[in-house]
Amino acid sequence: MANHVITATATMLEEMRNHYASDITGHLPAGALFVAKRSGCTITAYRTGKVLFQGKEAEQEAAKWMKESDQKEAPVPQPPLAAASAIGSDEVGTGDYFGPVVVAAAYVAKDQMDAITAMGIKDSKLLTDEAIRRLAPSLMNMIPNQTVILSNPMYNDWQRSGMPQTKIKALLHNEAIGKLVKQLSPIEPEAIIIDQFIERDLYFRYLENETNVVRDHVYCYPKAETVHVAVAAASIIARYVFLQEMERLSKEVGMTLPKGAGAQVDQAAAKLIQTHGPAILEMCAKLHFANTEKAARIAKK
């Protein structure tokens, strides 16, 4: 199916909505302003200003609006990986005292890139929790994905055994990627892109004793969400699952658990200690963080 994307101003979006008024459907994907279905073409306009034309008449339909738009965006020089059908992986939770570590792997094929980009998919750190909750469910239905959740008790066990956090992340990334590669089979991704947290050589050194290691076409890039949209998609999925886990843990302990590792977290942990005793932190926190000692001191006051 042919895809074509143009960028529209707010005025132009309103003109398009009026033009396609008789063709507008009721179902809206995440981030969309309207969807119109015409013979040979589906038009999806997004809040980002992107308008996606899909179908055999996509180019012809988009051409009607090209003079009013910014014209085709000048092609930006990109690394070859940016155009590949690829798996991206990213993690969330390693800097948060409360909650698990979540790694997500997501696969975006070439013919899905325009649709995913038009949705406004970008690094989850640039999006609010509300935006994550709005975008992620649709995204997870659109593309193959896998997540791995490392619970707090397991994280604490691994950390007490002397395992560095970088190795923990390497194990989780490899597991999530491996699950997705298996799900995709017989399709083979052209690239597997990890949001870099260590050098590639050290990443594989951490995995040398593992039985199942995904090695082919693996790349590690800093700010990898700018290299391929699959990494941005993975970051959104990982954060969405992390938010769900935080909600679940909050219900279990009877109070809202804050994100991060600041003073607000110290106070929350101290309240948990006072209410339930220090053992409660084992099941909802990363105990090696300095917050544990700070909370213990506050709880004694």
Swiss-Prot record:
A divalent metal cation binds at residues 90-91, 195. GO terms for biological process: DNA replication, removal of RNA primer; mismatch repair. Residues 84-301 form the RNase H type-2 domain. It catalyses: Endonucleolytic cleavage to 5'-phosphomonoester. It is found in: Cytoplasm. Belongs to the RNase HII family. RnhC subfamily. This is Ribonuclease HIII.
